[in-house]
């Protein structure tokens, strides 16, 4: 048997798998033609479920199984040389999972393997099949990875030569090893099979085209598990996208997973669900928002597919169906009610319509001066008077309030009942009297209306009908608001409120909408004011739990919101802190509406700028960061003072979200506003959840454990303990995710790393002020300071102060503004100190301004000035210390005055 190893094939151009002349000295041409010999894989290796092992763990319990291996029927990776009979040599080694395949740091071990990490089998002359039944994968540690890679690359270079490597070749090998270490995935390998046939000299040098197996995943790697969708809370959503879906799945890596939507047709449309690493909960649940469908307008539901997909490996789960439905433009059904066909009245008064007879004063009857027709109905009331009936109630009359006798009516219009009793006649008589009085009252109302032209005369006698509802549950007041009949609305309100103990003004329709809700939805501030002044209940909610404030903010209606907040009175605090059925407060909807003006109105009235929604505990700042709305986030942080370190129910701060989204601008904004870069959320860091950024860092706890065991000469535990067992045995607290652990952007990573390092001290600058001495100017103080600065001439005005505070770049910007001294806000925001401002004013001779800024100090701070500080050198009052600090110190030679040392703020 010829044990001379042929060159490794990593120098091959894998597009056509041809050898380079520098690798092999060919004695005969390759025997590969259309009908020549070739190598084929008969049984692929099993892709998942096989564990790579470290040296200290010993050999594997059984070799790498085949893809079709089952209990009771074992199979193993198998290859065959076709179109050839004779002796042949088949070698198998490990290569990377990416193309082109390159040498892998791991090695093969087993009975057929050598120290170089390759396995060899001799086949022929008849049976050309080779089965590798005892293959194992030896897992290299990151600590030893570099040396092993250089050794393998050296053997590859010198395999077919006996010469020594030059310095240039050694440097080239080291660079290649470093590059491979950066890109190589230690949890995935592939088998490369290469067949060698005998040449004329009897040596195995004629190489056939190599074949590469399917990827083999290390079973202990999170990426090795099969992707599976277990459950979703929604299977349908709007064609516009943006619907929030909760998806339960098997274990995934939060930085290597996406939710793919696609259509399996000729169009090939696909899109990804929108979520960040912070939306992946404990690696078993994903909260994502659906992408918009590629056709924004559809007339019927469309079914697509969704699946989980790994970004790096490309593995996918089984597909699930998802349905996009058309947009419901008129969700509140306002437009539908506006388009309803109204009854058509005849142009003449010839009668016949159930809405009124001829010659009569708007009665119900046969018309033409006809007779009265009052069929008895025991259920007569205002709720069924509007409903049409095959026997309409008649109450027509001629020229005056006259009615024919009941006996005459009975004789003319209907046949006498066969069974008539005294009680029945009495009941009928009472009913007829009631209708007669009603007709007389209506007639008088019509006469009064003819004299005064006031519609309220007609409505007053019909006020008991104001609570009647149509098939949608809408009252006359609902319909008047829907059709924006302002004059009718005023008249109906005046009539309705005159009913004692009435609640007609608060009646809801079938959509749980009150007239007040519809007035807000249809954007009629004047009507809303009328209803509120008529004591309509502003705290009632619609079917989605939305209050009046929610409805106004959903439409981003600043005018409506301003009017509501001005007239809600005692209900304002309750509504400002009332969530809807989705758990959103009004401040959250203001952020979603991208309206800083609405947000200012809410906060000014007492809304909590740090209020949390009920689903995930997000504040308005969390939502602004999720929306990547820099303007809104800046407004919340700088103007409204939102807490940049607030935490969701999962412990995520806005900085976690910004880092997860990979937004450098939002990250810088939050860090500048005081976000804690070391703040952790509630999810423990697992070995697989954090990717090691540096190739020189060995951050795998499992590998460190294995290496420590090898150094101590102790056998490693096998099988490997579960994460739950490791957590129980762990003594110290497990580290949780910081923003740095969640970012996928190198720019954001650099920003966070820089922020996490302590700033080097600057000798020429005073130490940063403590939190107790930070500058905080209210509007009154700023206006007072501006008046003092403008009283003096050049050299002591606000421009000179700006120069002394290092704000020279802002002088031209604020020069033409109504309040130039507001440039001090740019000194205040990054943490400018009160002491620095007082010293600058004192050096300009503005003692009055110094006294004004000192005056509003808190009582406890003034009391603290009387406290003496003891030391071994005596006692000195804090007041004297402050006076000494404010006194201009002598300037040494070569040093600039303090006014020129201030750091310039841009």
From Swiss-Prot:
A motif (Nuclear localization signal) lies at residues 336-340. CDD domains: IPT_NFkappaB, RHD-n_NFkB2. Residues 345-374 are annotated as: GRR. GO terms for molecular function: DNA-binding transcription factor activity, RNA polymerase II-specific; RNA polymerase II cis-regulatory region sequence-specific DNA binding. Residues 697-708 have a biased composition (Acidic residues). One of its GO terms (biological process) is rhythmic process. Residues 677-734, 857-906 are annotated as: Disordered. The keyword Chaperone does not apply. Residues 684-695 have a biased composition (Low complexity). The record marks 439-440 as: Cleavage (when cotranslationally processed). Keywords: Activator, ANK repeat, Biological rhythms, Cytoplasm, DNA-binding, Nucleus, Repeat, Transcription, Transcription regulation. Residues 34-223 form the RHD domain. It is found in: Nucleus; Cytoplasm. Residues 771-857 form the Death domain. ANK repeats lie at residues 472-501, 511-540, 544-573, 582-611, 616-646, 650-679. InterPro entries: Ankyrin_rpt, Ankyrin_rpt-contain_sf, DEATH-like_dom_sf, Death_dom, Ig-like_fold, Ig_E-set, IPT_dom, IPT_NFkappaB. One of its GO terms (cellular component) is nucleus. While translation occurs, the particular unfolded structure after the GRR repeat promotes the generation of p52 making it an acceptable substrate for the proteasome. This process is known as cotranslational processing. The processed form is active and the unprocessed form acts as an inhibitor (I kappa B-like), being able to form cytosolic complexes with NF-kappa B, trapping it in the cytoplasm. Complete folding of the region downstream of the GRR repeat precludes processing. Constitutive processing is tightly suppressed by its C-terminal processing inhibitory domain, named PID, which contains the death domain. Component of the NF-kappa-B RelB-p52 complex. NF-kappa-B is a pleiotropic transcription factor present in almost all cell types and is the endpoint of a series of signal transduction events that are initiated by a vast array of stimuli related to many biological processes such as inflammation, immunity, differentiation, cell growth, tumorigenesis and apoptosis. NF-kappa-B is a homo- or heterodimeric complex formed by the Rel-like domain-containing proteins RELA/p65, RELB, NFKB1/p105, NFKB1/p50, REL and NFKB2/p52. NF-kappa-B p100 is one of the high-molecular-weight proteins complexed with the v-rel oncoprotein in transformed chicken spleen cells. The C-terminus of p100 might be involved in cytoplasmic retention, inhibition of DNA-binding by p52 homodimers, and/or transcription activation. PANTHER family: NUCLEAR FACTOR NF-KAPPA-B P100 SUBUNIT, NUCLEAR FACTOR NF-KAPPA-B PROTEIN. This is Nuclear factor NF-kappa-B p100 subunit. It comes from Gallus gallus (Chicken). The gene is NFKB2.
